[in-house]
Amino acid sequence: MSEYTKQITRLISEVRSKKPLIHNITNYVTVNDCANVTLAIGASPIMADDIDEAADITSISSALVINIGTLNKRTIESMILSGKKANEKGIPVIFDPVGAGASALRNETTSTILDKIKISVLRGNLSEISYIAGRNASTKGVDASEADIQSNDSIAVAKAAAVKLGCVVAVTGAVDVISDGKNVVTVLNGHKMLSNVTGTGCMTTALVGSFCGAVKDYFKAAVAGVTVMGISGEIAYEAAGHKGTGSYHIAIIDAISRMDENIFGEKARINEI
Protein backbone atom coordinates (compact mmCIF):
# COMPACT_ATOMS: atom_id res chain seq x y z
CA MET A 1 0.00 0.00 0.00
CA SER A 2 1.36 3.40 -0.96
CA GLU A 3 1.84 6.14 1.61
CA TYR A 4 -0.87 8.16 -0.12
CA THR A 5 -3.37 5.31 0.15
CA LYS A 6 -2.50 4.97 3.83
CA GLN A 7 -3.35 8.65 4.32
CA ILE A 8 -6.71 8.19 2.63
CA THR A 9 -7.39 5.02 4.61
CA ARG A 10 -7.06 6.86 7.92
CA LEU A 11 -9.94 9.14 6.96
CA ILE A 12 -12.41 6.30 7.55
CA SER A 13 -11.79 6.54 11.29
CA GLU A 14 -11.93 10.34 11.15
CA VAL A 15 -15.50 10.30 9.88
CA ARG A 16 -16.65 7.60 12.27
CA SER A 17 -15.13 9.34 15.31
CA LYS A 18 -16.32 12.87 14.48
CA LYS A 19 -19.81 11.97 13.22
CA PRO A 20 -20.21 15.23 11.27
CA LEU A 21 -23.68 16.62 10.56
CA ILE A 22 -24.17 16.72 6.79
CA HIS A 23 -26.91 18.89 5.29
CA ASN A 24 -28.21 17.42 2.03
CA ILE A 25 -30.47 19.40 -0.28
CA THR A 26 -30.93 16.61 -2.75
CA ASN A 27 -33.52 15.00 -4.99
CA TYR A 28 -36.58 12.98 -4.01
CA VAL A 29 -35.51 9.99 -6.13
CA THR A 30 -32.42 9.24 -4.04
CA VAL A 31 -32.87 11.17 -0.79
CA ASN A 32 -33.36 8.03 1.31
CA ASP A 33 -30.28 6.34 -0.11
CA CYS A 34 -28.19 9.48 0.40
CA ALA A 35 -29.28 9.63 4.04
CA ASN A 36 -28.53 5.94 4.53
CA VAL A 37 -25.03 6.01 3.05
CA THR A 38 -24.26 9.09 5.14
CA LEU A 39 -25.26 7.14 8.24
CA ALA A 40 -23.47 4.02 7.01
CA ILE A 41 -20.10 5.77 6.75
CA GLY A 42 -20.51 7.25 10.22
CA ALA A 43 -21.82 10.76 9.58
CA SER A 44 -25.22 12.21 10.49
CA PRO A 45 -27.60 13.31 7.71
CA ILE A 46 -30.23 16.03 7.70
CA MET A 47 -32.26 16.52 4.54
CA ALA A 48 -33.93 19.91 5.10
CA ASP A 49 -34.90 21.72 1.90
CA ASP A 50 -37.62 24.19 2.91
CA ILE A 51 -36.61 27.78 2.27
CA ASP A 52 -37.69 28.85 5.76
CA GLU A 53 -35.13 26.63 7.51
CA ALA A 54 -32.51 25.49 5.00
CA ALA A 55 -29.93 28.21 5.71
CA ASP A 56 -30.37 27.79 9.47
CA ILE A 57 -29.73 24.06 9.17
CA THR A 58 -26.65 24.69 7.03
CA SER A 59 -25.25 27.03 9.66
CA ILE A 60 -25.06 24.21 12.23
CA SER A 61 -23.78 21.58 9.78
CA SER A 62 -20.25 20.44 8.96
CA ALA A 63 -20.86 20.24 5.20
CA LEU A 64 -23.55 21.10 2.65
CA VAL A 65 -24.37 18.79 -0.26
CA ILE A 66 -26.38 20.29 -3.13
CA ASN A 67 -27.86 17.93 -5.73
CA ILE A 68 -30.05 19.17 -8.62
CA GLY A 69 -31.51 15.81 -9.64
CA THR A 70 -35.12 16.96 -9.25
CA LEU A 71 -35.53 20.71 -9.50
CA ASN A 72 -38.22 23.17 -8.55
CA LYS A 73 -38.02 26.93 -8.09
CA ARG A 74 -38.42 26.92 -4.32
CA THR A 75 -35.74 24.29 -3.76
CA ILE A 76 -33.37 26.21 -6.01
CA GLU A 77 -33.86 29.24 -3.76
CA SER A 78 -33.09 27.05 -0.73
CA MET A 79 -29.90 25.82 -2.39
CA ILE A 80 -28.71 29.36 -3.06
CA LEU A 81 -29.48 30.61 0.45
CA SER A 82 -27.85 27.56 2.06
CA GLY A 83 -24.81 27.82 -0.19
CA LYS A 84 -24.31 31.47 0.70
CA LYS A 85 -24.67 30.65 4.39
CA ALA A 86 -22.11 27.85 4.05
CA ASN A 87 -19.66 30.23 2.38
CA GLU A 88 -20.24 32.79 5.12
CA LYS A 89 -19.53 30.19 7.82
CA GLY A 90 -16.59 28.48 6.07
CA ILE A 91 -18.57 25.27 5.62
CA PRO A 92 -17.62 23.13 2.58
CA VAL A 93 -20.14 22.92 -0.27
CA ILE A 94 -20.27 19.77 -2.40
CA PHE A 95 -22.21 20.15 -5.65
CA ASP A 96 -23.68 17.39 -7.82
CA PRO A 97 -24.86 18.94 -11.13
CA VAL A 98 -27.16 16.08 -12.12
CA GLY A 99 -28.10 16.32 -15.78
CA ALA A 100 -26.17 19.52 -16.45
CA GLY A 101 -26.30 20.12 -20.19
CA ALA A 102 -29.63 18.31 -20.59
CA SER A 103 -32.16 21.13 -20.17
CA ALA A 104 -32.37 24.90 -19.98
CA LEU A 105 -33.49 24.78 -16.34
CA ARG A 106 -30.60 22.54 -15.30
CA ASN A 107 -28.11 24.66 -17.22
CA GLU A 108 -29.42 27.89 -15.74
CA THR A 109 -29.48 26.45 -12.22
CA THR A 110 -25.96 25.08 -12.55
CA SER A 111 -24.68 28.45 -13.75
CA THR A 112 -26.47 30.29 -10.95
CA ILE A 113 -25.09 27.98 -8.27
CA LEU A 114 -21.55 28.24 -9.62
CA ASP A 115 -21.83 32.02 -9.92
CA LYS A 116 -23.25 32.65 -6.46
CA ILE A 117 -21.67 29.91 -4.35
CA LYS A 118 -18.04 28.96 -3.80
CA ILE A 119 -17.90 25.21 -4.33
CA SER A 120 -15.41 23.01 -2.46
CA VAL A 121 -15.99 19.80 -4.45
CA LEU A 122 -17.82 19.25 -7.74
CA ARG A 123 -18.84 15.62 -8.36
CA GLY A 124 -20.45 14.41 -11.56
CA ASN A 125 -20.14 12.12 -14.55
CA LEU A 126 -18.05 12.91 -17.60
CA SER A 127 -20.93 14.45 -19.55
CA GLU A 128 -21.97 16.76 -16.72
CA ILE A 129 -18.48 17.96 -15.89
CA SER A 130 -17.62 18.35 -19.59
CA TYR A 131 -20.58 20.70 -19.94
CA ILE A 132 -19.41 22.78 -16.98
CA ALA A 133 -15.82 22.83 -18.23
CA GLY A 134 -16.99 23.90 -21.69
CA ARG A 135 -15.41 20.88 -23.31
CA ASN A 136 -16.63 18.02 -25.49
CA ALA A 137 -15.52 14.63 -24.19
CA SER A 138 -13.87 12.51 -26.87
CA THR A 139 -15.51 9.17 -27.59
CA LYS A 140 -13.37 8.15 -30.53
CA GLY A 141 -10.35 5.91 -30.83
CA VAL A 142 -9.79 2.48 -32.29
CA ASP A 143 -6.68 1.37 -30.47
CA ALA A 144 -7.55 2.45 -26.96
CA SER A 145 -9.95 0.60 -24.70
CA GLU A 146 -13.18 2.30 -23.71
CA ALA A 147 -11.90 2.62 -20.14
CA ASP A 148 -8.66 4.22 -21.33
CA ILE A 149 -10.55 6.71 -23.50
CA GLN A 150 -12.84 7.59 -20.63
CA SER A 151 -9.87 7.96 -18.27
CA ASN A 152 -7.98 10.28 -20.62
CA ASP A 153 -11.08 12.38 -21.26
CA SER A 154 -11.91 12.50 -17.56
CA ILE A 155 -8.43 13.66 -16.59
CA ALA A 156 -8.51 16.51 -19.10
CA VAL A 157 -12.05 17.52 -18.18
CA ALA A 158 -11.48 17.26 -14.42
CA LYS A 159 -8.37 19.43 -14.60
CA ALA A 160 -10.09 21.99 -16.83
CA ALA A 161 -13.13 22.25 -14.55
CA ALA A 162 -10.96 22.46 -11.43
CA VAL A 163 -8.92 25.31 -12.90
CA LYS A 164 -12.05 27.12 -14.10
CA LEU A 165 -13.86 26.87 -10.76
CA GLY A 166 -10.94 26.79 -8.32
CA CYS A 167 -12.21 23.69 -6.57
CA VAL A 168 -11.72 19.93 -6.36
CA VAL A 169 -13.45 18.04 -9.16
CA ALA A 170 -14.38 14.35 -9.15
CA VAL A 171 -15.41 12.77 -12.45
CA THR A 172 -16.83 9.32 -11.80
CA GLY A 173 -17.26 6.52 -14.31
CA ALA A 174 -15.43 3.38 -15.41
CA VAL A 175 -12.31 5.10 -14.09
CA ASP A 176 -12.83 7.74 -11.41
CA VAL A 177 -10.69 10.87 -11.64
CA ILE A 178 -10.15 13.48 -8.94
CA SER A 179 -8.23 16.70 -9.61
CA ASP A 180 -7.66 20.13 -8.11
CA GLY A 181 -6.33 21.43 -11.42
CA LYS A 182 -2.75 20.43 -10.68
CA ASN A 183 -2.79 17.09 -8.88
CA VAL A 184 -4.64 14.10 -10.33
CA VAL A 185 -5.67 10.83 -8.70
CA THR A 186 -7.44 7.94 -10.38
CA VAL A 187 -9.52 5.31 -8.60
CA LEU A 188 -9.94 1.95 -10.29
CA ASN A 189 -12.45 0.47 -7.85
CA GLY A 190 -16.05 -0.17 -8.81
CA HIS A 191 -18.28 -2.59 -10.67
CA LYS A 192 -20.37 -2.16 -13.81
CA MET A 193 -23.48 -3.26 -11.90
CA LEU A 194 -23.39 0.06 -10.03
CA SER A 195 -24.83 1.65 -13.17
CA ASN A 196 -27.94 -0.55 -12.87
CA VAL A 197 -28.93 0.97 -9.52
CA THR A 198 -30.35 4.47 -9.64
CA GLY A 199 -28.67 7.02 -7.42
CA THR A 200 -25.20 5.55 -6.97
CA GLY A 201 -23.73 8.81 -8.22
CA CYS A 202 -25.85 10.78 -5.75
CA MET A 203 -24.77 8.39 -3.00
CA THR A 204 -21.14 8.95 -3.96
CA THR A 205 -21.63 12.70 -3.62
CA ALA A 206 -23.19 12.18 -0.18
CA LEU A 207 -20.16 10.12 0.83
CA VAL A 208 -17.81 12.84 -0.40
CA GLY A 209 -19.81 15.33 1.65
CA SER A 210 -19.48 13.11 4.71
CA PHE A 211 -15.71 13.07 4.42
CA CYS A 212 -15.56 16.81 3.73
CA GLY A 213 -17.46 17.36 6.96
CA ALA A 214 -14.76 15.52 8.91
CA VAL A 215 -11.49 16.58 7.26
CA LYS A 216 -10.28 19.89 5.85
CA ASP A 217 -8.32 18.38 2.96
CA TYR A 218 -11.19 18.27 0.47
CA PHE A 219 -9.06 16.64 -2.22
CA LYS A 220 -8.38 13.63 0.00
CA ALA A 221 -11.98 13.69 1.20
CA ALA A 222 -13.18 13.40 -2.39
CA VAL A 223 -10.78 10.53 -3.07
CA ALA A 224 -12.00 8.75 0.05
CA GLY A 225 -15.70 9.14 -0.76
CA VAL A 226 -15.31 7.99 -4.35
CA THR A 227 -13.16 5.01 -3.33
CA VAL A 228 -15.58 3.89 -0.61
CA MET A 229 -18.37 3.69 -3.19
CA GLY A 230 -16.17 1.79 -5.64
CA ILE A 231 -15.04 -0.75 -3.07
CA SER A 232 -18.57 -1.15 -1.77
CA GLY A 233 -19.80 -1.81 -5.30
CA GLU A 234 -17.28 -4.63 -5.62
CA ILE A 235 -18.09 -6.16 -2.24
CA ALA A 236 -21.82 -5.90 -2.90
CA TYR A 237 -21.47 -7.71 -6.22
CA GLU A 238 -19.61 -10.57 -4.56
CA ALA A 239 -22.30 -10.81 -1.87
CA ALA A 240 -25.50 -10.25 -3.82
CA GLY A 241 -24.87 -9.50 -7.47
CA HIS A 242 -26.26 -12.86 -8.53
CA LYS A 243 -29.56 -12.11 -6.75
CA GLY A 244 -30.46 -9.06 -8.83
CA THR A 245 -30.36 -5.30 -8.57
CA GLY A 246 -32.64 -5.01 -5.53
CA SER A 247 -30.42 -7.18 -3.38
CA TYR A 248 -27.33 -5.55 -4.86
CA HIS A 249 -28.69 -2.13 -3.90
CA ILE A 250 -29.06 -3.12 -0.26
CA ALA A 251 -25.68 -4.86 -0.29
CA ILE A 252 -24.00 -1.58 -1.31
CA ILE A 253 -25.29 0.12 1.83
CA ASP A 254 -24.34 -2.94 3.90
CA ALA A 255 -20.79 -2.77 2.54
CA ILE A 256 -20.48 0.93 3.32
CA SER A 257 -21.71 0.32 6.87
CA ARG A 258 -19.02 -2.32 7.38
CA MET A 259 -16.23 -0.26 5.80
CA ASP A 260 -13.16 0.07 7.99
CA GLU A 261 -9.48 0.81 7.52
CA ASN A 262 -8.59 -2.85 7.00
CA ILE A 263 -11.13 -3.39 4.21
CA PHE A 264 -10.37 -0.04 2.61
CA GLY A 265 -6.61 -0.52 2.77
CA GLU A 266 -6.80 -4.02 1.33
CA LYS A 267 -9.08 -3.20 -1.60
CA ALA A 268 -8.37 0.44 -2.53
CA ARG A 269 -6.86 0.93 -5.99
CA ILE A 270 -5.79 4.56 -5.85
CA ASN A 271 -3.15 5.95 -8.19
CA GLU A 272 -1.44 9.34 -8.17
CA ILE A 273 -0.87 10.52 -11.75
Curated annotation (Swiss-Prot):
CDD domains attached to this UniProt entry: THZ_kinase
Keywords: ATP-binding, Kinase, Magnesium, Metal-binding, Nucleotide-binding, Thiamine biosynthesis, Transferase
InterPro entries: Hyethyz_kinase (IPR000417), Ribokinase-like (IPR029056)
Catalytic reaction list: 5-(2-hydroxyethyl)-4-methylthiazole + ATP = 4-methyl-5-(2-phosphooxyethyl)-thiazole + ADP + H(+)
GO terms, molecular function: ATP binding; hydroxyethylthiazole kinase activity; magnesium ion binding
E.C. no: 2.7.1.50
Chain sites annotated for binding substrate: M47, G199
Residues the entry annotates as binding ATP: R123, T172
Enzyme class, UniProt record, top EC level: transferase
UniProt xrefs under Pfam families: HK
Pathway participation: Cofactor biosynthesis; thiamine diphosphate biosynthesis; 4-methyl-5-(2-phosphoethyl)-thiazole from 5-(2-hydroxyethyl)-4-methylthiazole: step 1/1
Keyword Metal-binding assigned: yes
GO BP term, example: thiamine biosynthetic process
Required co-factors: Mg(2+)
Function (record text): Catalyzes the phosphorylation of the hydroxyl group of 4-methyl-5-beta-hydroxyethylthiazole (THZ).
Family according to the record: Belongs to the Thz kinase family.
Protein name (Swiss-Prot/TrEMBL): Hydroxyethylthiazole kinase
